């Protein structure tokens, strides 16, 4: 594939649903432990360092079930679907 071609990136629906469940579960565990869940999750997604995620409620193991790019895709998709005023 040349530099002037666009690569396609795709995640199947099953992984999409799993990503939603993981994000909600990890967010709740971080919140219950008194962390800022958004900051911690951004730290994990950007760095790949699982120590940004608490072990409480097995959240660290749960978040590692999917690749970080799959989690990020779900975040972007949700944001754009809910904040895009243009019709698709």
From Swiss-Prot:
Superkingdom of source: Bacteria
Disulfide bonds: none
Pfam families referenced in this protein's UniProt entry, alphabetically: IreB
Protein's recorded name: UPF0297 protein Ccel_2240
Protein family: Belongs to the UPF0297 family.
Species of provenance: Ruminiclostridium cellulolyticum (strain ATCC 35319 / DSM 5812 / JCM 6584 / H10)
């Amino acid at each position: 594939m040349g530099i002037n071609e666009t690569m396609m990136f795709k995640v199947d629906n099953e992984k999409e649903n799993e990503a939603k469940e993981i994000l909600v579960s990890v967010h709740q565990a971080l919140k219950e432990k008194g962390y800022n869940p958004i900051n911690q999750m951004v730290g994990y997604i950007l760095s790949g360092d699982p120590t940004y995620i608490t072990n409480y409620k097995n959240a660290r193991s749960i978040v590692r079930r999917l690749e970080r790019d799959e989690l990020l895709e779900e975040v972007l998709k949700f944001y754009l679907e809910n904040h895009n005023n243009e019709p698709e």
